Amino acid sequence: MTPTLRRKLEALAERREELQHLLSDPEVVSNNDKFRSLSRELSQLEPVALAMQEEARAKADLSAAEAMRNDPEMRELAEEEILAAQARLDELDAQLALLLVPRDPRDEGNLFLEVRAGTGGDEAAIFAGDLFRMYARYAERQGWKVEIESDSPGEHGGYKEVVARVVGRGAYSRLKFESGTHRVQRVPATESQGRIHTSAATVAIIPEADDVEEIVINPADLKVDTFRSSGAGGQHVNKTESAIRITHVPSGVVVECQTERSQHANRDKAMKRLKAQLVEAERSKAAAAKAQTRKLQVGSGDRSQRIRTYSFPQGRITDHRVEGLTLYDLPNIIEGDLDALIARLLHEHQADELARLSEGT
């Protein structure tokens, strides 16, 4: 481990002691929001503390084994214990380095999934539908809920646009690298000549804003429209203007919801999504400024970035952000088997973050 990373570990150990002291302060205990926030931070540092304690024990074992090596009768046993202790220290060194990768506080939370057809006409809408189904099936495997907030079906299947809320622990941590442009190469069902077409769809992954995140939305900045829903709810939704469209005039962000029977419920859902979009826009602006000095291969979340190509004739998926990341398992992946792909992206992200930490940036 580099000296820079070791100093960061020591700083985290000091912060843990400071947090333990703060959480016993009556003033902090009486402030629910602050107490909850500091408790969450302390719980995130516990794995680091446990690994450092284990490292200290392994170092003590190594020292004892090295001392025992001076005894001729114990030398053989000492050599075995030295090898075991050194192997454990190497393992803990790698573990501690990964624990230094900053945890995104949004990782455990829910998200909004937006899939939109891009270039390619009807085939793009069909592909957008395929992508949405891929994520929905992956969510089902994880035990998450997928709630469609609004959709615009394509004329020949799929979606021109679909927005859903994905609810489940760790949802954002697993899907946050999916934002960007996804391209497909295949022979459309409507293609009589058997020619391969290329079309695209864009995906946006937006973390749901936490209740404690402060963002002030001036009601005067909102333009609210109602319209008849075409969503769930039977005939009732077509008789009343229960669907809501909210435009945040200063930013131009537009959200809508039509899945609930009541206008009030649709408005609540739409406002939750609007808050998430505005919070994420501020985060993206800050991240873009930070990234000007350094190129992030994974996790930029830029919707205009072409991140992946799905080549059906070859059964191949290529992620363009990671060198050599090509998987010949398209049939299973498009059916929601995303674990191998996500694992590679997470590994690349961790390596990228560790490189940044080692450089002290």
Curated annotation (Swiss-Prot):
Transmembrane segments: none annotated. Signal peptide: none annotated. GO terms for cellular component: cytoplasm. GO terms for molecular function: translation release factor activity, codon specific. The modification N5-methylglutamine is found at Q235. It is found in: Cytoplasm. Keywords: Cytoplasm, Methylation, Protein biosynthesis. Gene3D superfamilies: 3.30.160.20, 3.30.70.1660, 6.10.140.1950. Its main location: cytoplasm. Methylated by PrmC. Methylation increases the termination efficiency of RF1. InterPro entries: PCRF, Pep_chain_release_fac_I, Pep_chain_release_fac_I_sf, Prokaryotic/Mito_RF, RF-1. Belongs to the prokaryotic/mitochondrial release factor family. Peptide chain release factor 1 directs the termination of translation in response to the peptide chain termination codons UAG and UAA. PANTHER family: LD18447P. This is Peptide chain release factor 1. It comes from Xanthomonas campestris pv. campestris (strain 8004).
